[in-house]
Design a protein with these regions (language model features):
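Non-heme di-metal
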Residues: 1-72
Length: 72
């Protein structure tokens, strides 16, 4: 279980990586949902771009988990 939010400096690498991945996953889902609901093509495009960025971040975080033996 992660330390209290105010104590992030005391988190382990595993806690930090898991938190980062969870936040990226939540943002990805939200951007995908917003893109699906958008009626303005420009707004839809922006949300799809942001979802793609989150997908890239998730990939990077998963790659960082390996050397620390953290499973996604």
């Amino acid at each position: 279980m992660p330390a209290e939010e105010g104590e992030m400096a005391d988190w382990s690498m595993e806690e930090a990586l898991r938190m980062a991945l969870r936040l990226e996953e939540e943002n990805f889902v939200e951007y995908e949902k917003n893109a699906a609901e958008a009626t303005n093509p420009g707004v839809k495009s922006m949300f799809l771009f942001l979802a793609g960025e989150e997908r890239n971040h998730m990939k990077l975080i998963r790659e960082k988990m390996g050397p620390f033996n953290v499973k996604p």
